[in-house]
Amino acid sequence: MHTLKNIINKTFDNKLNIHQHNVDQKTTDAINQVLHMLNIGKLRVSEKINGFWITHQWLKKAILLSFLVNKNVLFSNKQTCFYDKIKLKYCNYTEEKFKNEKIRIVPPATVRHGAFIGKNTILMPCYVNTGAYIDEGTMIDTWATVGSCAQIGKNVHLSGGVGIGGVLEPLQNNPTIIEDNCFIGARSEIVEGVIIESNSVISMGVFIGQSTKIYDRNNKKILYGKVPSGSVVVPGSLPSKNNCNLYCVVIVKQVNAQTLSKTGINKLLREITE
């Protein structure tokens, strides 16, 4: 692994001089090996270590380099053709392999090579970009998008039209992270490396980036970039210095995992005025 990391870092430092026609086979093999290991979940761009999310920047670099060194290739799903530098994850899957991994995929769901999909996952017609990691028991609903290198935990529900931001375009330092047992409401957007901690419920139409004010109603505090564990979050607004109300999101209550498991999502959101 140390050798792979050194090759990637050294090549990335020289990226302005690298292209398809001058890259050596050893470098190409190293880059493609990293993508394969991301694809099967042996590596992940970001992981929680001792309670903190750590981003492995060299893995992001490998993904970016793959666009420099790999050529566009023609591939087909029997309905139409594609022409891209990264193939689709399930191009060569057999029925047996799908059964073993207990994954259900509804057309035209699209997953690029380099993304990991855990067991017991359901993919409605959605899009999952390379480098993403989706853990077990998660559902990605219709027209939801999981951006490059985004990290999605166990038993997460991404509702219809949800957008989870990537890190490659525009380039971001850290991936967007949705921890275990979270519910993200329809048409919400979580981007720019924001972390939604475990057991949180995000209402429909919530937009959170690094500059979005996250107002904790009970504690009267403003947070940025992270929604604490067990939060129930809805759209809102706060008055500015010029008496103009500006968009924010509001943490209206905190719930623990036990309450979340026993209480319907709709009930939690309908009781926000209590």
Curated annotation (Swiss-Prot):
Belongs to the transferase hexapeptide repeat family. Pathway: Amino-acid biosynthesis; L-lysine biosynthesis via DAP pathway; LL-2,6-diaminopimelate from (S)-tetrahydrodipicolinate (succinylase route): step 1/3. This is 2,3,4,5-tetrahydropyridine-2,6-dicarboxylate N-succinyltransferase. Homotrimer. It catalyses: (S)-2,3,4,5-tetrahydrodipicolinate + succinyl-CoA + H2O = (S)-2-succinylamino-6-oxoheptanedioate + CoA. Its EC number is 2.3.1.117. InterPro entries: DapD_Trfase_Hexpep_rpt_fam, Hexapep, Hexapep_transf_CS, THP_succinylTrfase_dom1, THP_succinylTrfase_N_sf, Trans_hexapeptide_repeat, Trimer_LpxA-like_sf. GO terms for molecular function: 2,3,4,5-tetrahydropyridine-2,6-dicarboxylate N-succinyltransferase activity. NCBIfam families: dapD, PRK11830.1. Keywords: Acyltransferase, Amino-acid biosynthesis, Cytoplasm, Diaminopimelate biosynthesis, Lysine biosynthesis, Repeat, Transferase. It comes from the Bacteria. It is an enzyme of class 2 (transferase). GO terms for cellular component: cytoplasm.
